Amino acid sequence: RQMCIRDRVWVGDTLYEGAAVVLATGHSARDIYELLHRRGVRLEAKPFAMGVRIEHPQALIDSIQYHCESRGEYLPAASYSLVSQEGGRGVYSFCMCPGGFIVPAMTDAAESVVNGMSPSGRNSVFANSGLVTEVRLADFEHLRAEWGELAGLKFQQQFERLARQYGGEHQIAPAQRVADFVAGRASGSLPRTSYIPGVVPSRLDKWMPGFIASSLRAGIATFGRRMRGFLTNEALVVGVESRTSTPVR
């Protein structure tokens, strides 16, 4: 039976009544957004954020935050929270994972998307965090004529497909050493990473949207002045972190 949303909803043969209906799909359900748009449900484009995952050796973050060579057996894996304004655009860390892993998070084989997680013991030798910058409505205005209120979704998808293009099959992700990313040079090799599918060297600073690359490079330089050692070629940026929030509401 076709579902009708007014003050009641049919789901199969069951009738649910109420003053409102919450459709809790999760922010990566692009097919649901497109279905609602086709059915005439009002959607509205909104600002969101995109960037990369940045990964350091956990021992390096420990030494920066605890100001000692080793945290010992009693202190937990150190974390951080960073934010700056670069050219009027916000840059910030997101979902920092001490003692954690970078994990694949794509919902389509044609995309490359990464996220992070920490096991309960926070006992990985790596620390990672999302590092993102704000994406404004004006940044995807050029897609509005064709996609309307779904333009942000399409901009997000284009970013993720570029990452897949410069990464590889089987969820291999594009990556670049952090100091190389900031300096605008290629990485001839990559350090070890927690990302199990693997990474390949790539000039993220060249193929990602220019405003994202420039904002992240400036932000990392700022964070390197606040946390001595943060800006280092021992660290990696891995592409891409693009699902911090939904581009529509």
Whereabouts are the PLM-identified features?
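Residues forming the flavin
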Residues: 2, 6-249
